[in-house]
Design a protein with these regions (language model features):
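RNA-binding basic/glycine-rich loop and surface signature characteristic of RAMP-family CRISPR effectors
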Residues: 1-351
Length: 351
């Protein structure tokens, strides 16, 4: 069975504008920016795109964990990374698509284009971050006045919100590459295969992909030490993840204020509905919903479920979480304690 890290987070921000959508078309003012929001039913919810969350994550890995990020190549109207998951950990964990063709000369001396596209499905998958409760978005009108003459007005959206998100990491996919002629699975070309083997990668049979004769295709797996380091850094980065628009005047802490982590023998994401809106239209974490998920997936959860909460956020949950943690399958502590204890368990689960 496929083992995946499964994570659920709540972040809590005040007077923020974490991900903007460009010019505000609801006003005639030229210098006005709108935040990203989406309509659900007849209510508006502020959100951060999954791409933006990934950008924060990747940038944190570069700055806090010294990841050497894959250089970006720009050609005409396209841009892509080096598509080298052996050398660059972000190409491995975040995936890539490098669509390209090169000119070759065939056996008859004729020149033709050959497809050399490389793609990789990201082992790290994540949702958008979206406010749990409907969001009242305020327009803040400001002006630049530190000059002679008329002031220059500008506007921006701001909001307060508790936002939820979920993510997963495929433990067996991280650091493991295929060369199957299929979109998302053509991870390596011959040069990269050789590079992987030069780095002591293991060549192994693909349990799912076969050639026309029924023979298994090959996978190339990096050493366990390398794979473990990349996965561990990715999870641990949540302790210090930072980012978001308008940070100069609207600084916000985007680290989790509540987190749930476990390893699941499935690629399913079971934690999507752990947060809900209460009668006062405020965000609320549902312990009964968590208990139901843990019970329903008890045959697929490997090891314990780790819960972390930052003191000062949803303090009303403290007693219930402590009581729940008397269950041997549940760990409860601070955010960083939960992340670090989960990593200890995960290290034993990586193939």
């Amino acid at each position: 069975m496929a083992k995946t890290v499964q994570g659920f987070v709540l972040i809590d921000v005040d007077v923020a504008a974490l991900n903007n959508a460009g010019k505000d078309t609801s006003t005639t003012m030229d210098n006005a920016v709108a935040t990203k929001k989406i309509l659900k039913g007849n209510k508006w919810y502020a959100y951060v795109s999954g791409q933006a969350w990934r950008y924060w994550w990747r940038d944190t890995l570069k700055r806090e964990f010294n990841w050497k990020l894959s250089p970006i190549v720009r050609e005409k109207k396209t841009a892509f990374t080096q598509a080298d998951p052996v050398t660059f950990p972000d190409d491995d964990i975040f995936g890539y698509m490098r669509a390209a063709k090169e000119e070759i000369t065939d056996s008859k001396g004729k020149k033709k284009k050959q497809n050399i596209t490389l793609t990789r499905v990201s082992p790290l998958k994540n949702s958008a971050l979206i406010s749990v409760a409907p969001t009242k978005i305020e327009k803040n009108w400001s002006s630049m006045t530190r000059h002679e003459g008329d002031a220059v007005p500008f506007g921006k959206d701001e909001y307060c919100a508790t936002m939820k998100g979920m993510f997963s990491i495929a433990l067996e996919q991280a650091g493991t590459f295929s060369s199957q002629e299929r979109t998302g699975f053509k991870n390596l070309n011959e040069k990269l295969k050789n590079l992987a083997m030069d780095n002591n990668a293991e060549e192994m049979d693909d349990p799912f992909a076969m050639d026309a004769k029924g023979n298994p295709l090959k996978l190339y797996r990096l050493q366990k030490k390398t794979r473990l380091e990349r996965i561990r850094d990715t999870v641990k980065a949540l302790e210090v993840i930072n980012g978001g628009a308008m940070q100069t005047n609207n600084m916000a802490d985007v680290t989790p204020k509540l987190i749930v982590l476990t390893t699941l023998n499935s690629a399913n994401h079971p934690f999507s509905h752990l947060a809900k809106i209460n009668a006062a239209e405020k965000a609320e974490f549902s312990i009964p919903a968590l208990k139901q998920v843990v019970q329903d997936y008890s045959d697929r959860i490997e090891g314990r479920v780790f819960i972390g909460r930052r003191m000062g956020f949803m303090d009303e949950l403290e007693d219930d979480f402590k009581e729940y943690s008397t269950n041997d399958k549940i760990f409860y502590g601070s955010i960083n304690q939960a992340i670090r204890e989960y990593i200890k368990q995960m290290e034993m689960q990586i193939p």
